[in-house]
Swiss-Prot record:
Cited SUPFAM superfamilies: ARM repeat
A GO molecular function held by the record: nuclear export signal receptor activity
A UniProt-annotated Pfam family: Xpo1
Protein's job: Mediates the nuclear export of actin and profilin-actin complexes in somatic cells. Oocyte nuclei lack active actin export.
GO biological process, one term: protein export from nucleus
Localization per Swiss-Prot or TrEMBL: Nucleus; Cytoplasm
UniProt domain Importin N-terminal: residue ranges: 31-97
Protein name: Exportin-6-A
Signal peptide span: none
Record's GO cellular component terms: cytoplasm; nucleus
InterPro entries linked: ARM-like (IPR011989), ARM-type_fold (IPR016024), Exportin-1/Importin-b-like (IPR013598), Importin-beta_N (IPR001494), XPO6 (IPR040016)
Natural source organism: Xenopus laevis (African clawed frog)
Family affiliation: Belongs to the exportin family.
Organism phylogeny: Eukaryota, Metazoa, Chordata, Craniata, Vertebrata
Keyword Protein transport included in the entry's annotation: yes
């Protein structure tokens, strides 16, 4: 090697060149290779130590530390003991001497490298590692440095990465736990000393004008006078350096709390100190523009930067954020030892004192203005605390006499409804939802105490209901609600407004469950008020010839109307959301309320359809027209929500006095025909269609087809001259009309169902719907493009409607399915005839196969064996290897979808319990394994694979006797592994395909196929079968272990471990004595002694938890040994 000085200059030059904008990628790769080779040389660390002590180049310093890091984590095993000792002595000295001059990120990296040494050698060879950290903290000049070391040690030693053997990980955690009491005492001392030092100099404040209110609440929340006094002291004025030390100490505590168990080491003194700092977030007087990060390390030990003598308010707020992080780490622990219950109460009491401080009003500040001054991160942390308290600990605290829950709810109410941000408000609503769930579950478990429980909380629930309802109404909250986006969809397909409304209505619904009478009367009163405005609009209509105009023109009137319409739309959604609370056991008790709602909704829907407000000219069309459309759509949707109530109502009055029910249904149906039109906005059209579907499917009144308005809809759909509706509306309407004719009427004897008449009507309906499609009979594939596209459109539209009709009656009785098949039999046969002609048109083929899939799933019996066999044979003949390849390999996904649909049909076929389809099994297996599997086996894309493997699984699962014919009795008397087998070659090929799939990268296929094997084992003892046990099981176990070792499917560690256990449990003795040694013998990259250690550490225990723990230990340690061995220089001797 060259001299150290020359090497340093060369390295600096290379680094400058590497990071220069003009350096090519090829040259960068050359430099990278050169640097890697240098790092692998024996003794390179000495040069790197020289570079660290002499260079001012950040790139050089970072590279030098990375050499040390790589050596310690990967090559330490082969480093001579004397050199290790030199490194252990020299690096801490370097850190101590230069930490004030080094850039902060370099200093942090150096700390990490030293901790890595401790991770390897403490306490045996580096006995003073942790002692040195404690000494650094105790020395004022190095306290920040010691805290960085401590936090790094907690991060790297308590939860180490994969590059340590399991035994060492366990040892490190145990060693650290032994140090926890000392560390916590030390950190408590650091924080207390700084707080006390600066509190002495803090001025005594004048008495607060609201002091008496504060004291009253404190006396309820905190029953310890000294604690009350401590928390009421004014906050200290910290120096900048002291603020940094406190921030680091709190970061250390936060990380420690994330992994140490709750115990007496977390003393009342420490908790009080943390809360002292948490107060600082409440007292902040300036709001940060950027969110605070909890990693303050970067700014702590940077000696190059100068700091003001006193920390600004935002830095004090940061301490409040960090302190709340500590508290939340404690709160998220669900397992609370009995001896820690008192501490938990103390934590809650102290935090609610802070909640009171946040929500108090003074002469100078309203609650909202106080919130706007607080740091956003602090408010988020505080909301997290409240969520954890309610979801995890409320059940522990509620019954404690020292905890005033009602006062807490008062503070939570103020906290919720003064949130400065929408996200903050919605997070608080989630907390209330959790509280309401808690109350509901408590009442269900103690029904005899229902009145007492609700009585205790009734006032709070009433306040909450009123405020939530006000918050969703433009009348009270227009400015904030107008800001919500109602156009852009998020990942859940909701707009901002829809998400806000949904959150709010969920809370309203939960209150309705607890206070049904009050909630309903409050909501219905608000609905009535806005309905009166809407229904009164007919007085403002001005007619001009055939056109009508809404004569509301004054700006203020338009604004008020806009607010009222938006509120009516929201309240209609609320009423629909509450429909579930009027059915079931509550039907009788709440009947009158529900009837009032339904009658009002029917009135509103008919009113909207009659005067066609959605088509009116308005003074502000961009605002009022969407409002009017939405109100009408929501009234239809709200009425649809009551379809289950209507069904129950129908069953109650069907035999006596049905007049009122008939009137409701007839009036509701009268609102639909004007909306079934291409001229009506699609939102309204679809709402009308959905309502008709619900009435036809859920309510099923036997008089529905006799209603003139329903007959109008029937005529509209079957009229060939009428313009076709949009596809979704057309499908929904056809479904509704088909269901009217096919679904049995409730509570009507079979002999009175009028099946003959309904069958005739259904046949006419489908004849009308398939008129154009049936004209294709006998025709060939059109050659002209325009004609071909028109024909394809007819096929796809018709089969789409027919498929939907079939899918919707697939679970119904035999008679409904018989009538359905009779009506579409001609179309089904025509589809099979046309199929070969359109085999190369992927979109048409997919629609045809979807239709046949629906037939197989819903009408298989009605089709009869000859026709189903004809369909299967046609498909098997058409899907040759060439056709499969063409479909799968074509651009886009349409071709793959065709093959997937075909495989889904075969899945239905192989699950058929009878004997009719058994002759097809050899052909299906041949198609799968000889024609399809070779095409997709090596393709990285998961397309088709999932469906193919599901088909293979279903074939094995439902046709096990195709391979194992012996009877159940014979299996019982014979050893299960010795059953005679048939079709062995096909079975082996299928199992090999499953095994091959575990070598592929797709995790979904892996998970699916692993679960299939486990199911076959649990149902058919697959792993115990002689063929599998002797010829396949070792390979499967080996592949699964290799997958774990290579970490290619880490998300499935648990599932893989269980599968390995189930395979090994077939014969544990063979696994331990034969498989494990052979597996380790075949493992590359390990020496003989390491293999022996791995075998010795694998405990021969046969219960699932112990076995899987041994598997994961084996995998972890094997990976670690390989990592070390791969990084050792050639010729290394390991002792």
């Amino acid at each position: 090697m060259a001299s150290e000085e020359a090497s340093l200059r060369a390295l600096e030059s290379l680094m400058s060149e590497f990071f220069h904008n003009g350096t090519s990628n090829e040259r960068k790769r050359e430099i990278e290779s050169l640097l890697n080779n240098f790092a692998q040389q024996l003794g390179a660390w000495r040069f790197c130590f020289y570079f660290l002590s002499q260079s001012q180049n950040d790139y050089v310093l970072m590279y030098s530390l990375s050499v040390f890091e790589n050596m310690i984590n990967k090559m330490w095993l082969g480093v001579p003991s004397q050199e290790k000792m030199e490194i252990r002595n020299s690096l801490p000295k370097l850190l101590l001497s230069q930490h004030k001059s080094l850039p902060s990120f370099i200093c942090n990296k150096l700390c990490k490298v030293i901790v890595d040494m401790g991770r390897q050698d403490w306490p045996m060879f580096y006995h003073d590692f942790f002692t040195n950290i404690l000494q650094l903290i105790q020395t004022p000049s190095t306290t920040p440095l010691g805290l960085i070391m401590l936090k790094t040690a907690s991060e790297e030693l308590a939860c180490p990465r994969e590059d340590l053997i399991v035994a060492r990980k366990e040892e490190l955690r145990k060693l650290l736990l032994e140090q926890v009491p000392t560390v916590l005492d030390l950190l408590t001392g650091v924080l207390e000393s700084i707080w006390d030092k600066h509190s002495i100099t803090a001025a005594t404040p004048p008495p607060s004008p609201t002091a008496s209110d504060t004291d009253d609440l404190l006396s309820n929340l905190i029953h310890t006078p000294n604690l009350t006094k401590q928390l009421s002291q004014p906050p200290p004025s910290l120096e900048a350096e002291s603020e940094r030390v406190c921030a680091l100490a709190l970061e250390c505590l936060s990380h420690l709390f994330s992994w140490i168990p709750l115990s007496a080491s977390i003393t009342p003194s420490l908790l009080t100190t943390i809360f002292q700092f948490a107060r600082l977030g409440c007292d902040a007087r300036s709001r940060q523009t950027n969110s605070v990060t909890t990693n303050t390390t970067a700014s702590v030990v940077n000696g190059r930067s100068s700091s003001p003598p006193t920390a600004p308010a935002r830095d004090l707020a940061r301490l409040g954020v960090l302190a709340m992080s500590c508290i939340n780490e404690l709160m998220c622990k669900n397992c609370v030892p009995l001896e820690f219950q008192e501490y938990l109460l103390r934590v809650c009491q102290q935090t609610f004192y802070l909640l009171q401080r946040i929500t108090r009003e003074t002469n100078a500040h309203s609650v909202r203005s106080r919130f706007e001054e607080l740091d956003e991160s602090y408010v988020e942390k505080f909301t997290d605390f409240l969520r954890l308290f309610v979801s995890v600990h409320l059940r522990r605290i509620e019954s404690n006499a020292q905890f005033p829950l009602l006062e807490f709810l008062t503070l939570l109410f103020k906290y919720t409804f003064h949130q400065p941000t929408r996200e903050g408000y919605l997070s608080c609503l989630d907390i209330w939802a959790q509280f309401l769930d808690y109350l509901t579950n408590k009442i269900r478990n103690r029904l005899e105490d229902r009145d007492a429980i609700i009585g205790r909380y009734e006032d709070a629930l009433v306040l909450l209901l009123n405020e939530v309802l006000n918050r969703i109404q433009f009348r009270y909250n227009q400015t904030q609600l107008e800001e919500l986006d109602d156009e852009t969809l998020d990942d859940d397909q909701q707009t901002e407004w829809q998400r806000y409304l949904r959150h709010s209505l969920e809370v309203v619904a939960k209150i309705m469950d607890l206070l049904p009478t009050h909630a309903f009367s409050k909501l219905f009163a608000a609905l009535q008020e806005n309905l009166n405005v809407y229904l009164g609009l007919q007085r403002c209509l001005v007619t001009n010839g055939n056109d009508q105009r809404l004569n509301v023109t004054a700006e203020n009137d338009c604004r008020r109307l806009h607010c009222s319409l938006r509120d009516l739309s929201s309240l209609l959604q609320a009423v629909g959301r509450l429909a579930e609370y009027f059915i079931g056991d509550m039907f009788g008790a709440r009947f009158n309320d529900a009837l009032t709602v339904v009658e009002r909704l029917v009135e509103v829907t008919l009113y909207g359809s009659r005067i066609k407000l959605y088509n009116m000219e308005t003074a502000v069309p961009s605002v009022l027209k969407p409002d009017l459309i939405d109100v009408h759509a929501q009234s239809l949707a709200a009425l649809q929500a009551y379809s289950h109530w209507l069904a129950r109502y129908y069953s109650e009055v069907q035999r006596q006095n049905p007049e009122q029910f008939i009137s409701i249904i007839s009036t509701a149906m009268e609102a639909l025909p004007p909306l079934i039109s291409t001229k009506v906005q699609e939102k309204l059209l679809l709402s009308a269609c959905h309502l008709l579907v619900s009435i036809a499917t859920t309510v099923r009144p036997m008089f529905l087809l006799n209603i003139p308005s329903v007959q109008k809809v029937f005529s509209r759909v079957t009229d060939s001259s009428a313009q076709r509706l949009p596809e979704e509306a057309q499908v929904l309407l056809c479904r509704a009309l088909s269901n009217v004719l096919l679904l049995p009427w409730p509570n009507v004897p079979e002999g009175e169902q009028q099946w003959a008449e309904r069958s005739s009507h259904h046949s006419n309906l489908l004849n009308a719907l398939t008129r154009d499609y049936r004209l294709l009979k006998g025709s060939s594939l059109p050659q002209r493009k325009g004609q071909l596209e028109a024909t394809k459109r007819v096929i796809c539209q018709t089969l789409g409607v027919l498929r939907d009709i079939v899918e919707n009656i697939s679970g119904e009785g035999t008679k409904s399915r018989q009538i359905c098949y009779q009506s579409l039999q001609e179309s089904a046969q025509l589809s099979l005839t046309l199929f070969p002609a359109y085999i190369h048109q992927s979109d048409v083929t997919e629609e045809m196969l979807s239709f046949f899939l629906a037939l197989f799933q819903g009408l298989r019996v009605q089709m009869g064996a000859p026709f189903t066999e004809q369909i299967i044979q046609t498909f098997l003949n058409m899907f040759t290897r060439e056709q499969l390849a063409e479909s799968i390999l074509q651009e886009g996904s349409a071709g793959c979808h065709v093959v997937e649909k075909f495989l889904k049909i075969l899945q239905v076929v192989v699950q058929e319990p009878g004997q009719s389809f058994k002759p097809f099994l050899p052909s299906i297996l041949s198609l799968c394994m000889e024609q399809l599997y070779p095409i997709i086996a090596e393709r990285p894309s998961p397309d088709v694979k999932a469906e193919l493997f599901e088909l293979l699984f279903q074939l094995l699962h439902h046709n096990w006797r195709y391979f194992y014919r012996s009877s159940v009795l014979a299996s019982v008397h014979r050893d299960g592994s010795d059953e005679p087998m048939e079709n062995q070659a096909q079975f082996i090929v299928v199992m090999q395909a499953f095994g091959q799939s575990f070598l592929q990268p797709d995790i979904h296929i892996f998970r699916q196929n692993l679960s299939y094997l486990e199911t076959l084992n649990s149902k058919h003892k697959l792993y115990h079968k002689k063929l599998f046990q002797t010829g396949m099981l070792p390979q499967f176990v080996s592949v699964l272990l290799q997958v774990l070792i290579h970490k290619s499917h880490d998300l499935l560690q648990e599932e893989i471990g269980i599968a390995v256990y189930n395979m090994a449990s077939v014969d544990f003795s063979t696994f331990f004595s034969t498989f494990l040694p052979e597996f380790l013998t075949g493992c590359q990259g390990l020496d003989t002694s390491q293999k022996s250690v791995l075998a010795r550490n694998f405990k021969m225990e046969r219960d699932l938890p112990s076995f899987t723990q041994s598997v994961h230990r084996l995998v972890n340690d094997l990976r670690y040994y390989r990592l070390c061995n791969d990084s050792l220089p050639p010729g290394t001797v390991k002792l």
